[in-house]
Amino acid sequence: MLSGRRLDLLDPSPFDVEIEDIAHGLARVARWNGQTIGKHIFSVAQHTLLVDAIARRQTGGIDERLALAILLHDAPEFVIGDMITPFKAVIGDSYKIVEQRLQGAIHLRFGLPPTLPDDVRRIVKAADSGAAFLEATRLAGFAIDEALGFFGPRPALPEAVERDFLTPWPAETAEERFLAQFVALTKR
C-alpha cells in the first residue's frame, strides 16, 4: 500500500488498514470493468458516494454509522478489484471468504461491527441496487427494461444529484470526495 502498510489478504488485520489507501485504491478501480461512457472511469469510490446519496433519499436521512457502513460497503475492492457479479458466482465461496475477511477487518478498523446487522445490510443493498440501475442505464448502455430485470426500480434522485454523481470524475476528485465524506462522518 502507498501508506507503507502490508495487508495480508488471507488474514487481514485492522491495524494494516488505512483510509487513505482505501480512498486511493477505490478511486482507481473501475465499475463495470471500465465499460462506461465518459473521459474517466466510473470508479468504485464515486459509486459508494452515489449509494450514500440514494440511501439518504430512500430512508429520509441516515445516521453517521450507517453512512460510514455505506461508504465502506465496497471497501475490500481497494485491493481485490471490482469483480463483476457473474464472475463472482463462477469463482464461488473462495472469493466471498476473502471479501468477507477484508470487510470485517475494515469495519473493525473504523469502529463498525465485522458483520453488519440485517436491517443495515438491507438498506445498503437497496441503495446499491438503485445505484447499479442508474449506472447501467446512464453509463453502461443498458436498456431500462434490462436494468429493471437485473436491479429493480430506478431510484428517485434530484436531477442535479444524478448529473453530479453520474458524470465520471477524475481519480483525484473521486479520492478527495471519498476522503471528505469519511472525515465528515468520523470527525477525523
Predicted stretch roles:
Residues 1-188:
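Metal-dependent phosphohydrolase cores
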